[in-house]
Amino acid sequence: MARMKDKYLALKAELQADLGIKNPMQTPALEKIVISVGAGFAMKDNKLIQNIEDTITTIAGQKASTVIAKKSVAGFKVREGMPVGVRVTLRGEKMYNFFDRLVSMALPRVKDFRGVPRNGFDGRGNYNFGLQEQLIFPEVSYDSVMQIHGMNITVVTSAESDKAGFALLEKMGMPFSKGSN
């Protein structure tokens, strides 16, 4: 079993007591993690899109998929059918393994890291934040990267409020910044 899942099961009762939840089934839990890269800068270069897809697949441990434009938008020089991004959705064991690597290995490698911002919650207990580069993950070698790009990570929880989502992620080891940003 994943180390982070064991940690969650150990702190579930404590989290339930802290939030004043009577039914243990209402205790917030991680549902999925979505990693996405908007690759508008690489629309015309299929090799670069493939490289981004391979990098995200390596980071996530699961095959990433290319996002295709549904409509043409002249202002962005996007045509219907063009690749505009890459994403992967993690659930279950792979989700817990990725979260563990993110919190314990990747985020501490960010230059001048002072914690992830607290204002990334959406009002329903889900958390979004961005990373500036993919090289903070130990799985990615510098030689295999064609272009440095960032990514957006969405952590979807079963929490019904931001307070419950924050409590869950904080107890699971997410390094939030100290300020009230």
Swiss-Prot record:
Which GO terms fall under biological process for this protein? translation
Q: Which family does it belong to?
A: Belongs to the universal ribosomal protein uL5 family.
Keyword annotations of the record: Ribonucleoprotein, Ribosomal protein, RNA-binding, rRNA-binding, tRNA-binding
Alphabetized GO MF terms = rRNA binding; structural constituent of ribosome; tRNA binding
- What NCBIfam families is this protein classified in? PRK00010.1
* Pfam families assigned: Ribosomal_L5, Ribosomal_L5_C
Any idea what this protein is called? Answer: Large ribosomal subunit protein uL5
Q: Which organism is it from?
A: Sulfurimonas denitrificans (strain ATCC 33889 / DSM 1251) (Thiomicrospira denitrificans (strain ATCC 33889 / DSM 1251))
Q: What interactions and quaternary structure are annotated?
A: Part of the 50S ribosomal subunit; part of the 5S rRNA/L5/L18/L25 subcomplex. Contacts the 5S rRNA and the P site tRNA. Forms a bridge to the 30S subunit in the 70S ribosome.
The role this protein plays is: This is one of the proteins that bind and probably mediate the attachment of the 5S RNA into the large ribosomal subunit, where it forms part of the central protuberance. In the 70S ribosome it contacts protein S13 of the 30S subunit (bridge B1b), connecting the 2 subunits; this bridge is implicated in subunit movement. Contacts the P site tRNA; the 5S rRNA and some of its associated proteins might help stabilize positioning of ribosome-bound tRNAs.
Q: Tell me which PANTHER family the record gives.
A: 60S RIBOSOMAL PROTEIN L11-RELATED
